[in-house]
Amino acid sequence: MDISKGLPGMQGGLHIWISENRKMVPVPEGAYGNFFEEHCYVILHVPQSPKATQGASSDLHYWVGKQAGAEAQGAAEAFQQRLQDELGGQTVLHREAQGHESDCFCSYFRPGIIYRKGGLASDLKHVETNLFNIQRLLHIKGRKHVSATEVELSWNSFNKGDIFLLDLGKMMIQWNGPKTSISEKARGLALTYSLRDRERGGGRAQIGVVDDEAKAPDLMQIMEAVLGRRVGSLRAATPSKDINQLQKANVRLYHVYEKGKDLVVLELATPPLTQDLLQEEDFYILDQGGFKIYVWQGRMSSLQERKAAFSRAVGFIQAKGYPTYTNVEVVNDGAESAAFKQLFRTWSEKRRRNQKLGGRDKSIHVKLDVGKLHTQPKLAAQLRMVDDGSGKVEVWCIQDLHRQPVDPKRHGQLCAGNCYLVLYTYQRLGRVQYILYLWQGHQATADEIEALNSNAEELDVMYGGVLVQEHVTMGSEPPHFLAIFQGQLVIFQERAGHHGKGQSASTTRLFQVQGTDSHNTRTMEVPARASSLNSSDIFLLVTASVCYLWFGKGCNGDQREMARVVVTVISRKNEETVLEGQEPPHFWEALGGRAPYPSNKRLPEEVPSFQPRLFECSSHMGCLVLAEVGFFSQEDLDKYDIMLLDTWQEIFLWLGEAASEWKEAVAWGQEYLKTHPAGRSPATPIVLVKQGHEPPTFIGWFFTWDPYKWTSHPSHKEVVDGSPAAASTISEITAEVNNLRLSRWPGNGRAGAVALQALKGSQDSSENDLVRSPKSAGSRTSSSVSSTSATINGGLRREQLMHQAVEDLPEGVDPARREFYLSDSDFQDIFGKSKEEFYSMATWRQRQEKKQLGFF
């Protein structure tokens, strides 16, 4: 096969090939996400511009089905190698095994992966055609990354901890195990809808959900007609095999080289790893706790070594006794994945050619423009600034485990022995928003820290649960926190008195001033001795009679200007400027005599070049479990989830409005930092963000953001339980199901008869379980339209329906579906689409259009 002819080049997107008769053939796009167990696949993902992160690599995956033979594997391996040769060194290679795919791989297929029986590529036709004469049972597993596997059509396949989908062509019944979480149910439902929409001609199938068997007798009757009567109890839930963060933190780096005819694998280092351990002429294996094996190839390594990368990784896996399905990722020098880079303490893109100036480096010296920060979230995220700090500020000090207000005159004067709450109020695009900073002093007690959190919760309740909460550790204050106090943040090494005043422990005190403007200056008290000095900074030495301003040789004019602002906060005594090297004797006497101190010029702090990463959080047996979401977008934020966004300088924890474990969020963030293989600082700020109240510093990390995305979506409970928000659609479903033709029902006659009889049962019982099918929206029960049957045929006039109060509508018109009574021509004219097209859209999008056009 001529690879170059079939190669999509660097065109962005996803491209998939399947093994067939010892060769690889393209998979039609409509079949993406479906994998046949007796085949191997090659998947190429090329980042799409402008979404792609600058310098992002392509990913090339080799996927092996559980039943794949040697011929299929050989064809896929050879094809992948030839693709790699065509693409060059900017490609990350992956080996994937069915049921154990990497997070990167799973991120391509939303809402889930379908594993199918069969071994012929012709089976792909089953994915693309609209067959309704089908009976199959799918076992659905997973939280963020969902998969569905075809299993035996029997009750023996069921267990209490998973979700099962009985697909009968014209009807799909999702059975939720009693031990499944609300998040798993919602994800399962999303996959069910996706299957229905892709495989049933855009949605021509009803969906039923069994959450409680006792409350869904009709659906259970259908299931028993197909599966037979269940004998005995269900199997217990299968224990989860999730890999927790402690396991992932067990990282070891090995140097792999040849010595004569032997291959030597030498353990080189354990965390924290540094980038300089990797030499460009060598070959390395990085073992992440047996969970994943990375192979790093230096740019000067031999062609033979690079071609042997996978075989060496497989040999390493066998030697370690790891499972054969262990994931393998091969990265090239200069094209490392984000996951690989974050296994190292720091990572510099020193080898990247013609690198443009990064947003943060370029912008940090630019004067802040509040308007741009409000309208350009990406800039706000890079600078970590929601505005210039000129909003309203309220401060409380935690004393006697309660919050005490701090006099505004003393705002910005914090004590290391205390904890503080700082509430910042600002406006963005006409909307009031809040940030609550939880500042923790180094000398604060455990009880005070606990009181800090409980008082923050009380404030959040007082403000209706809309506060963004940022946990800040003394000395690691984020830029916006510093900007709030306009360069006058001073941290005293003491405890605050009951009136918010510092209780002085000494008459001689030394303060270090660091910063060049009102947005980055911090002043901290340090031990009053000569060894605390540093030539790069300015120090204020306060004695009983005078306040010395000591200017180190490495400081500049901006630093001196800020020091003169700070000195007015610290002391009212006479000021005396002292240049390094020209100190009077009394200066050294106050410090207890001369002593060595750092005198070399401080190098600029290097800004880490790590890409942001998004994870779904959960826990297993008390340990944090993360599932990474590659190529993330706002669509990946689900109301039932807690998501962790790691931007390296901050950790955001996004709390979905229906998340059940939100109280664990901060602890999860702390555990994430503690167990991170790169040895992250535990003082990294942790920010709690509530769904619907995201600040621009969070929004800016997403390519696009829709602030109204969640305003019209029905909840999972509304959909399943038939709450008022979905009640009007349930009768429509019942009406359509009542009109199903027995001849179109799949399976034998008895099953069809039982199913039809069950579905013709009382509407009361089905209302709790049947989920709306968009195609059914044009149907009505006879009782609901009897009074308007005459006018429906011709349609009501638009002025009778648009912008009308409920009491002003014609008799018999359903207020929730008033648009339905328009004539077909009026409907097309107003909505720009036919009724069939309109009712095939998602419910929330229908509501949105109806609101805009006056039909709500």
From Swiss-Prot:
Database matches in CDD domains: gelsolin_S1_like, gelsolin_S2_like, gelsolin_S3_like, gelsolin_S4_like, gelsolin_S5_like, gelsolin_S6_like
Domain of life: Eukaryota
Positions of Gelsolin-like repeats: 22-74, 146-186, 263-307, 401-450, 521-561, 624-665
A Gene Ontology molecular function term of the record: phosphatidylinositol-4,5-bisphosphate binding
The keyword Ligase appears for this protein: no
A GO cellular component annotation in the UniProt record: cytoplasm
Tissues expressing the protein: Ubiquitously expressed in 16 tissues examined.
HP domain mapped to chain residues: 790-856
Database matches in SUPFAM superfamilies: Actin depolymerizing proteins, C-terminal, gelsolin-like domain of Sec23/24, VHP, Villin headpiece domain
Stored InterPro entries: ADF-H/Gelsolin-like_dom_sf, Gelsolin-like_dom, Gelsolin-like_dom_sf, Villin/Gelsolin, Villin_headpiece, Villin_headpiece_dom_sf
Chain intervals for the UniProt region annotation (Disordered): 762-796
Cysteine disulfide links: none
Keywords noted in UniProt: Actin capping, Actin-binding, Calcium, Repeat
GO biological process, one term: actin filament severing
Signal peptide stretch: none
Bias type Low complexity, positions: 776-791
UniProt record similarity statement: Belongs to the villin/gelsolin family.
Physiological role: Possible tumor suppressor.
Protein name: Villin-like protein
Species, as recorded: Homo sapiens
